[in-house]
Amino acid sequence: MDKRHDPSRRIIAPHGTQLSCKSWLTEAPMRMLMNNLHPDVAERPEDLVVYGGIGRAARDWDCYDKIIEVLQRLEDDETLLVQSGKPVGVFRTHADAPRVLIANSNLVPHWANWEHFNELDKLGLAMYGQMTAGSWIYIGTQGIVQGTYETFVSVAKQHFEGISKGKWILTGGLGGMGGAQTLAGTMAGFSVLACEVDETRIDFRLRTRYVDKKATSLDEALAMIEAANQAGKPVSVGLLANAADVFAELVKRGVTPDVVTDQTSAHDPLNGYLPQGWTMAEAAAMRKTDEAAVIKAAKASMAVQVQAMLDLQTAGAATLDYGNNIRQMAFEMGVENAFDFPGFVPAYIRPLFCEGIGPFRWVALSGDPEDIYKTDAKVKELIPDNPLLHNWLDMARERIAFQGLPARICWVGLKDRARLALAFNEMVKNGELSAPVVIGRDHLDSGSVASPNRETESMLDGSDAVSDWPLLNALLNTASGATWVSLHHGGGVGMGFSQHSGVVIVCDGTDAAAKRVGRVLWNDPATGVMRHADAGYEIAKNCAKEQGLDLPMQD
């Protein structure tokens, strides 16, 4: 019997102000853990899988139940320790310490590979936490929509003089992360053709308004794109097909998209990528009998897809890696020039990271969308001179369906995160908001990740693989008084290729919360400015000086 599979489970986080725990500081992690497994949020909630292949919220259902039980009895001077999705200890700390500390998927470097991890996983000794799955701050696909939107806007500026009308993006994957591409692309003015092998994912994206249309053949999909572009109105199409097949076929036909990328779960060749010519049922059966054959076939198909991406780049497409490690997989299969197209961070995002700008997100624990709309207005009030941000908030309200507890994300930096959070805390205190909010972020942020094939690719000083930085980030956030802090390995790009940390803090309207919020949401983005200043980026050095950061070696 698989202790991780229970189709009878239907998890919905409580709404409103009635507590199941002893305070909001423990109610918040409980609700957010439950929200990660909401049927409109998680990809396979019956298996505890939130997103990203096998990114889970808890190791198994026994562990999930015990975590909930412990959070409901936890005192405000105690801390729960969670080891790869398993609650392993409760210790007396103090009121400003985190209520939960989480470590997921971490392995000693020599053994930090999928083969060893999968053995531990089968033995029930480990859990893949991805980034926000095991750290209980996943908010559905909205979580990366704005970052993807910012990237596509940058692509238009760099390659098409800012004009995206009549242009289209080819991509793969409509899972928890990839599903953002279609909506973000159309928001940025592009049409999008996204290949997906799992029809239920396409249907889910249709239901949540992330995809406009579904196609079952390439000809049908291309006709939809062509019609939309002729009409001057972007459209997103989910094509039921294998990305490797489609990308290669477009090369064969001489059809060149304007932009090419991919967000399949290529980081996990065993569980995340369907080999060419295989059905999903065949792959599921083979995973139980011959893992090596699945991995080999998946990586061979990735090599086909990456070669097609390179060919489309040569034909004139703006081609970028979107952080799923597909280039590495293809390189290992003999595609020697797999890294000839850039990752999205060095190509488009790094200047933002240099100012501590990244994916700031918050969730209304009340369950009331009005709380989010009120905070949207507060963001506009406090940041009046950022039209791109205002445009994002307007589009998000109009086009993004909430999944589970209402949430919002917007990319803001060092100078704004703490003051926004303090304003939210004041709104809780004075009753403008009906219940507390939690504030967190993706682990994909300026100071919280080491990932040489993604966030820290091509660092100016060559420090791509130095992972001291996310460790320092987690330690500082713990010392600063975050409500829960997490330290993970392997998110985004898979085992052996990344280390990263997460942070969440509760705004419950108290003066004590205001002090914690002020520390955490200044220090957290400040570590990103510090990290990039240390690597030699002038934007970061100037930001550090302007914001008065004390960086001894920058004097």
Swiss-Prot record:
One of its GO terms (biological process) is L-histidine catabolic process to glutamate and formamide. Its main location: cytoplasm. GO terms for cellular component: cytoplasm. Binds 1 NAD(+) per subunit. It is found in: Cytoplasm. The keyword Transmembrane helix does not apply. The active site is at residue 410. It catalyses: 4-imidazolone-5-propanoate = trans-urocanate + H2O. InterPro entries: Urocanase (IPR055351), Urocanase-like (IPR023637), Urocanase_C (IPR035401), Urocanase_central_sf (IPR038364), Urocanase_CS (IPR023636), Urocanase_N (IPR035400), Urocanase_Rossmann-like (IPR035085), Urocanase_sf (IPR036190). Pathway: Amino-acid degradation; L-histidine degradation into L-glutamate; N-formimidoyl-L-glutamate from L-histidine: step 2/3. It is an enzyme of class 4 (lyase). The keyword NAD applies. It holds the Pfam family Urocanase_C. Its cofactor is NAD(+). Belongs to the urocanase family. This is Urocanate hydratase. It comes from Shewanella putrefaciens (strain CN-32 / ATCC BAA-453).
